[in-house]
Amino acid sequence: MRTTPMANASNIERKWLVVDAAGKTLGRLSTEVASILRGKHKPTYTPHVDTGDHVIIINAEKIELTGKKLTDKIYYRHTQHPGGLKSRTALEMRTNYPEKMLELAIKGMLPKGSLGRQMFKKLNVYRGSEHPHQAQKPEVYELRG
C-alpha cells in the first residue's frame, strides 16, 4: 500500500519573498499573498500544517482600489467603550495606515484559529521600498496576472 507523504514541521523549507504593491489592486494582491502564506503554491501543501513562506510587502502606500472604494469603503473599529465605534474611509487608511489596510485584507483570507494566526506572523508589510530583512536574502516574487 502506498501512502501520500505528509508535510510536518521538520521537513518544511521556507523561503522569503518580496512583493511590490505599487500599482496593484488590493484584493488581487491579497488573495495571492494569502495563498503563499498558507503554502498552497507548493506541492507539499498540507491543510493541517503551516507550509507557507515568509512574505515581505513593500510600497504599501501605493496600493490601488477600483471604482469608488477609496471614498465609499469604510473600515470600522471599536474602542470597547460605550459609543466607541470609530470609522475611517479607505482613502484615510491608505494615507495614514497603509500597512494596516493590507494586513486586514490578508488576515480575512487566512484560516480563523491558531494555524491562521501562525501564518499571519509570517507577513511583513512596509511603507516605501526599504525593509529590514536583507539578511534573509528574499527573492522578488512577481504576481500572476
Swiss-Prot record:
<dbReference type="GO" id="GO:0006412">
    <property type="term" value="P:translation"/>
</dbReference>
<dbReference type="Pfam" id="PF00572">
    <property type="entry name" value="Ribosomal_L13"/>
</dbReference>
<keyword id="KW-0689">Ribosomal protein</keyword>
<dbReference type="InterPro" id="IPR023563">
    <property type="entry name" value="Ribosomal_uL13_CS"/>
</dbReference>
<comment type="similarity">
    <text>Belongs to the universal ribosomal protein uL13 family.</text>
</comment>
<protein>
    <recommendedName>
        <fullName>Large ribosomal subunit protein uL13</fullName>
    </recommendedName>
</protein>
<dbReference type="InterPro" id="IPR005822">
    <property type="entry name" value="Ribosomal_uL13"/>
</dbReference>
<dbReference type="GO" id="GO:0017148">
    <property type="term" value="P:negative regulation of translation"/>
</dbReference>
<dbReference type="GO" id="GO:0022625">
    <property type="term" value="C:cytosolic large ribosomal subunit"/>
</dbReference>
<comment type="subunit">
    <text>Part of the 50S ribosomal subunit.</text>
</comment>
<dbReference type="InterPro" id="IPR036899">
    <property type="entry name" value="Ribosomal_uL13_sf"/>
</dbReference>
<comment type="function">
    <text>This protein is one of the early assembly proteins of the 50S ribosomal subunit, although it is not seen to bind rRNA by itself. It is important during the early stages of 50S assembly.</text>
</comment>
<dbReference type="InterPro" id="IPR005823">
    <property type="entry name" value="Ribosomal_uL13_bac-type"/>
</dbReference>
<dbReference type="GO" id="GO:0003729">
    <property type="term" value="F:mRNA binding"/>
</dbReference>
<dbReference type="GO" id="GO:0003735">
    <property type="term" value="F:structural constituent of ribosome"/>
</dbReference>
<keyword id="KW-0687">Ribonucleoprotein</keyword>
